[in-house]
């Protein structure tokens, strides 16, 4: 017999409630999208070229890669005339492990043609309110002793407002000193979504690898994130549809990666070519495991997956 321990069964048995809750959550999310006439799609998990991004490292699989997100293939479907699509899939990112991170995790992504990021914020809120309601939370939810009011409308603040409200320096100073992420994590994130969920939007242009810039202000991208109880749950944006600008951003990301001695990815040319027929659209990625953490009232992502990597 292999190294079998009763402890393994005991640890799994302790997760009965959390895994049941997780299954019900995924079913309620799927139900929302079916009711709203979305097509559920499946795209390959193993791909020849991920989107080059400065802070995300893909896991190699032979001479291809495991997807860090289904984004590129889903956008190719949008460009081919599929206007409302969603997918719940496994994604993989190298060197991501912690109480809130897994190297293999479950992501919900959806895209809507002729939507902008503000419309998508509204739809994200409606979807989550419906999912929480299906799970028995109509008024509020408690996570780590924080009582979070789920009543609509949820809080919406710009990144610049969040900096002026919570940070010791302005957003301009943070960008000049290359401290944006540091200040966001230390001072701002812990204050977001505390009494009610918070959408923080209008990110600096340099932090928007695949997002459209605002027509009225090219220093700002039409990007948003959702926080509940200080935990980042989702990231969405109005999609960039300009093929030349997207190629240039990918090249800049490749250079930033090279400076860190990270791999240079093949350019995802089929995705870039598809942008020529891409309608105006918006898309979002939401972490299912983190959402399950909130519903299970736990601070450890391991509690809501059957087998974290160390249990294999």
Model segments located where?
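TRNA-binding/sensing appendages of the translation machinery
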Residues: 1-59, 286
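Cytochrome P450
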Residues: 15-24, 112-118, 142-158
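Residues at alpha-helix termini
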Residues: 35, 79, 130, 134, ...
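Short amphipathic C-terminal alpha-helix that caps PH/PH-like domains
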Residues: 121-131
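Alpha-helical scaffold segments that mediate packing/assembly in large oligomeric complexes
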Residues: 133-172
